[in-house]
Amino acid sequence: MQNNENKVALVSGANTGVGFQIAKALLENDYIVYVGSRDLQKGEAAVEQLGGSSKAIQLDITDSGSIHSAVEIVEKEYGYLTLLVNNAAISHAGTPGRTLEEIMGAQRASIAPVSELRKVWDTNVFGTLALTQAFLPLLHKAPSARIVTVSSALGSLTINANPQNPYRSNFDAVYGASKTALNGIFLSLAIDLENTGIKVHLVSPGFTATALNNFQGTDSVEEGSKEPIRVALAEDLPTGSFTGPADFSGEDNILPW
């Protein structure tokens, strides 16, 4: 166990995409970074690319045993956690190989299989909360700590309720609504922890070309990761913030709930 002068971060789903870019930026800013990946070999391959003080850690946020093992490793090696980045998510649980349009069409509230909602929400909502709750004791042991959860502007009720929003038809019952639920739970957590040394932030990336959308996003992973990286590195943001890219957000990148 080392002293708590080191900045120690864990990023879930960090072997690729936005999570990988966040891990890279944290390493460049003197963090020790645990690279969470369901497949440990993929995590180790990412660490080979990242170098520095990166460490691969097997982490399936839908598996309580995997979460418990990850907590034990961090506790044994450092005894605390400075930053938890909740990035792991899935966009669907249906037939692979479909286009983004096919996936979104099948996720409309009138026809979406409840089994698919359960599968996606198990990762995006319940798994994310389970991981966070498990690491709270180690976050409390840091002098100050932050939880940064990657959400989506697609989960904003205010944006989707606006008839002038050209993208409102993309708000679906599976992925989009999972981000709405995620926002609500983590705003509740921010309120719960507001008198502690732990800040809670939600952040939306751009429409990034990643495996989450079959690489059909309009932003490069580097461009789309800019706002999550900014939030992950910012230590002075007020707790309970929800920010995103400039095309949806207002002053100071603030998104409406």
Each PLM stretch: what is its role?
Residues 40, 58-72:
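The beta1-alpha1 cofactor-binding region of Rossmann-like NAD(H)/NADP(H)-dependent oxidoreductases
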Residues 52-55, 73-86, 92-97, 104-105, ...:
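A glycine-rich helix->loop->beta "capping" turn
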Residues 2-34:
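Canonical Rossmann dinucleotide-binding motif of NAD(H)/NADP(H)-dependent dehydrogenases/reductases
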Residues 180, 195, 202-203, 210, ...:
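C-terminal helical subdomain
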Residues 29-45:
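Conserved glycine-rich Rossmann-like NAD(P)H-binding loop of the short-chain dehydrogenase/reductase
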Residues 85, 131-135, 139, 185-186, ...:
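Hydrophobic positions on the long internal alpha-helix
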Residues 90-121, 140-194:
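Catalytic loop of short-chain dehydrogenase/reductase
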